[in-house]
Design a protein with these regions (language model features):
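Sec-dependent N-terminal signal peptides
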Residues: 4-13
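Generic recognition of well-structured, leucine-rich alpha-helical segments
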Residues: 11, 179-180
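Sec/Tat signal peptide C-region and signal peptidase I cleavage site
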Residues: 14-18
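Transmembrane beta-barrel domains of Gram-negative outer membranes and organellar outer membranes
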Residues: 19-151, 156-163, 167-174, 180-187, ...
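A mid-sequence, solvent-exposed acidic-amphipathic segment
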Residues: 186-235
Length: 312
């Protein structure tokens, strides 16, 4: 609860700072157009630096299939993963202001921790502007809390889903997304902190990771996407899981963004089995080298929920 209050306070302070800087802006200064560094709210596994304007809401569906190849893939094992469902997420994200977004979602989850409910805030503190050297990049802060509503296993088993109480069912992510568009190419760097309230003995409650993402248009409506995360783990934690025959791999995704009239469709390939950062940062054990990557897609539709009267 203290962490949740800290996150809310953090966004309140940042929002107040943003309002103050707007007030003291010189009215005679030349106005520049905001640069749209990424087109969507998500790259593949990673969030993007973008936020929705005030009153705009998106409805999104993410779907991760089973392994394409490897021991659990191929024609005879689930027809290249299409017969299996690793994870599904359905969510909404709405612009409360032109900088602050609120999101809520439900994800199936993969592995031991399932039945996940997410809420989060996304605040864009800085915006890159076209032909303005004073605003060379965009910076967004994202924070969430995820609750697992699944039935807990026996606490004597000491598994990661052997929840002891309501508080132990939660995990939180705080992420800073920094991005810049160079001509047609968009690059993003996103360091991340993950805290999991309950972990099995030998695992780490606190993890740091760093991610990166790229976007490169191949045509007006067909775009190449890729993202990658590396999680920093202690050697003792690595040795603990290795003794149980578990090895971790960095999540990597590559895919295509297809922009259609009214919808944005992503066709992706990734070794991550979970959709939420709270899970794939901690527990990606699938390897591209062993064929343990999967088809995935994201479908997004934007709606106007309310209009900003000041913008008229």
């Amino acid at each position: 609860m203290k962490r949740l209050l800290f996150v809310v306070l953090l966004f309140t302070v940042i929002n107040s700072f943003g309002q103050e800087t707007t007030i003291i802006k010189t009215p005679t200064k030349q106005e520049f157009t905001n640069t749209k560094v990424f087109y969507s709210q998500k790259v593949i596994n990673s969030k993007s630096v973008e936020v929705h304007p005030k009153g705009i809401m998106d409805f999104s569906i993410d779907h991760y299939f089973g392994d394409i190849a490897g021991d659990n893939g191929g024609v005879r094992h689930g027809f290249f993963g299409l017969d299996a469902i690793k994870d599904v997420r359905i969510g909404f994200q709405i612009g409360l202001t032109d900088r602050l977004n609120f999101l809520i979602a439900r994800a199936k989850g993969s592995g031991f921790v399932t039945n996940q409910y997410e809420w989060g805030l996304k605040y864009q503190a800085l915006r890159q502007k076209d032909n303005d050297p004073g605003h060379p990049l965009s910076l967004t802060i994202f924070a969430n809390d995820v609750l697992s509503a699944m039935k807990a296993t026996d606490t004597a088993l000491h598994l990661e889903n052997s929840f002891e109480d309501f508080g132990s069912r939660h995990s939180q992510v705080v992420q800073v997304l920094v991005a810049r568009k160079f001509g047609k190419l968009s690059l993003q760097l996103n360091p991340l902190y993950l805290h999991t309230n309950y972990v099995e003995p030998g695992a780490e409650e606190d993890l740091f990771a760093v991610g990166g993402a790229i976007r490169l248009p191949l045509s007006k409506k067909f775009v190449l996407l890729a993202d990658y995360f590396h999680t920093f783990r202690s050697q003792s934690s690595i040795d603990f899981f290795a003794s149980k025959g578990i090895g971790f791999h960095d999540p990597f995704g590559i895919g295509f963004e297809i922009i259609t009239e009214g919808h944005v469709f992503h066709l992706n390939f990734t070794n991550a089995t979970d959709i939420l950062e709270n899970r794939f940062i901690r527990g990606t054990t699938s390897s591209w080298g062993d064929g343990e990557f999967r088809w995935a897609f994201t479908l997004t539709r934007n709606f106007v929920v309310f209009r900003d009267k000041k913008a008229k």
